Amino acid sequence: MAKTKGIRISITLECTSCKNNNNKRSTGISRYMTQKNRRNTPNRLELKKFCSHCNQSTIHKEIK
């Protein structure tokens, strides 16, 4: 029997305020790697996480 593709997939979360903010602590964009269950959350994931470049908790959105 062939194995099916797993329900859990790896996604990347990217800080939304790093793109717009010019007065940051350091250059770059904060990214987190995590997993999500396709069956429970079919739409794009948004989480509030700490951004080391902005030095505050910001919204991180799922990217492709």
UniProtKB/Swiss-Prot annotation:
Pfam family for this entry, one: Ribosomal_L33
GO BP terms, alphabetized: translation
Keywords: Chloroplast, Plastid, Ribonucleoprotein, Ribosomal protein
MF-aspect GO terms: structural constituent of ribosome
Protein origin, superkingdom: Eukaryota
GO cellular component: chloroplast; ribonucleoprotein complex; ribosome
SUPFAM superfamilies linked to this entry: Zn-binding ribosomal proteins
Location within or outside the cell: Plastid, Chloroplast
Protein family per UniProt: Belongs to the bacterial ribosomal protein bL33 family.
Protein name: Large ribosomal subunit protein bL33c
Organism listed in the record: Mesostigma viride (Green alga)
